[in-house]
Amino acid sequence: MGVNAVHWFRKGLRLHDNPALRECIQGADTVRCVYILDPWFAGSSNVGINRWRFLLQCLEDLDANLRKLNSRLFVIRGQPADVFPRLFKEWNIAKLSIEYDSEPFGKERDAAIKKLASEAGVEVIVRISHTLYDLDKIIELNGGQPPLTYKRFQTLISRMEPLEMPVETITPEVMKKCTTPVSDDHDEKYGVPSLEELGFDTDGLPSAVWPGGETEALTRLERHLERKAWVANFERPRMNANSLLASPTGLSPYLRFGCLSCRLFYFKLTDLYKKVKKNSSPPLSLYGQLLWREFFYTAATNNPRFDKMEGNPICVQIPWDKNPEALAKWAEGRTGFPWIDAIMTQLRQEGWIHHLARHAVACFLTRGDLWISWEEGMKVFEELLLDADWSVNAGSWMWLSCSSFFQQFFHCYCPVGFGRRTDPNGDYIRRYLPVLRGFPAKYIYDPWNAPESIQKAAKCIIGVNYPKPMVNHAEASRLNIERMKQIYQQLSRYRGLGLLATVPSNPNGNGNGGLMGYSPGESISGCGSTGGAQLGAGDGHSVVQSCALGDSHTGTSGVQQQGYCQASSILHYAHGDNQQSHLLQAGRTALGTGISAGKRPNPEEETQSVGPKVQRQSTN
């Protein structure tokens, strides 16, 4: 009897640089490539139509490429734990290959399948190819803890063995005598389903801005490397109006689904740099997008609560407001701030927004204006973003909300000034918010300030055709900076933490706070006269600090107060490469100095202002 093998695709939807599939084929007489449509997809069933379409296009492209090898993709619906015992028997399987999944829910799922395979006498092949490095080795090198500063992470990877080269693409020569049994009714049994078959209404669905699949990914990679201006200098391009639109060289969704190998991208960048720079060694900053991705993967791999505030050992427990109405306005692009609303509209329509646009809307939702938990924003991104990745998405939201990977909280993106500096003419606003198309550039970012005559000429009356701003940004950001400052001051009382290394006496002053990001940010200007704190241009490489608080409790005023649980674990990761952690035994302590009494701002609004009144909190 021959050796029958199965390769299970999850991420890694490609034939290039697929070491698990390549090893599976070696010594096998038959191989079947399967994809299981299951509730574990992306760690959540909260997936929008654009993401489902991208996935199905990836599967169709994979099936087309397998056909060139006289093979096919077998798409099977169900739970892996139910599907595999049946397949092992029905197909008489001897070995199963998978790409290593570093995320906690993926590791749990794979452990269960390995157990079933062992019981069935099936050999399991697991190979790392979704990340550049073996994340467990990074953690081991750091004394068993994930590095929580980007600088520390860079130090660790510089000590590791050089990366392995990508493995050869699966070709007919690689397949040799290994065949795939395909029945006449394959498409009926195992074909890639349509969106309609999955229950989606596709009436009026515009064509995809980002076509899915390995073929498109490799084409984009070549375009990416050919960009003349970028290749010449290897510098981050400056932010401008065109940066906000989907680029034909964009790669993030393809890296997320594994249509493009991160190792192939890494080595293509390396080769190009050496060719242009005459064999000089490339700096780590060349690989910024890939290394930030790796950094968040490492931070998340052993933390199943990484996407939660409660129970997450690296997340500050901040008493965010619960405000479903305000959350819905933000998610649906109805905040009354054209810059924020245009970004959220683009996200919902196309499934992608520029990483600095992500920062702007994340800041607005959390510490900037609405004081709503980063978890809520993360869920919206998880639904709508094509490149939403469990580790990177959660890590990025924690960072920008100042809940972890500490950023200077007194920097705040202005929902008027930031957009105006990026796209002074407002073309981006007109593209995604056609209701505002008639406004002149002077008023398109703050149309509520336009005289009535201009609003009438634009055929858009603010408060009728387009909403009034839901908050007064200058007041809301000032109040929220103060709230965050007091939370961190409370933490800093436990000396040795040094969490407020640089809290300015003037929180509206300039500074060089790093920009949170999956991809280091371009040089930008922040808010000035339009209200809110100024944002210094940064490269995304600032020292990252993190700490964990204990439980919250409610004080006598009815306002949730921040406290420490008995024997709470507070972690501190010091500046630079020297990383230390301290276990502090602290009694229950409420937040010390309270926030000045007063209402949340309520400027020119038709609805109630966001959040409850903030009452003075007493010292315990």
From Swiss-Prot:
A motif (LIR 6) lies at residues 285-290. FAD binds at S252, Q289, H355, D387, A388, D389. GO terms for molecular function: DNA binding; FAD binding; photoreceptor activity. A motif (LIR 10) lies at residues 411-416. PROSITE patterns: PHR_CRY_ALPHA_BETA (PS51645). Residues 3-132 form the Photolyase/cryptochrome alpha/beta domain. Expressed in the retina. High levels found in ganglion cells of the retina. Pfam families: DNA_photolyase, FAD_binding_7. A motif (LIR 12) lies at residues 486-491. Binds 1 FAD per subunit. Only a minority of the protein molecules contain bound FAD. Contrary to the situation in photolyases, the FAD is bound in a shallow, surface-exposed pocket. A motif (LIR 8) lies at residues 379-384. It comes from the Eukaryota. The keyword Cytoplasm applies. Transcriptional repressor which forms a core component of the circadian clock. The circadian clock, an internal time-keeping system, regulates various physiological processes through the generation of approximately 24 hour circadian rhythms in gene expression, which are translated into rhythms in metabolism and behavior. It is derived from the Latin roots 'circa' (about) and 'diem' (day) and acts as an important regulator of a wide array of physiological functions including metabolism, sleep, body temperature, blood pressure, endocrine, immune, cardiovascular, and renal function. This is Cryptochrome-1. The lineage of its organism: Eukaryota, Metazoa, Chordata, Craniata, Vertebrata.
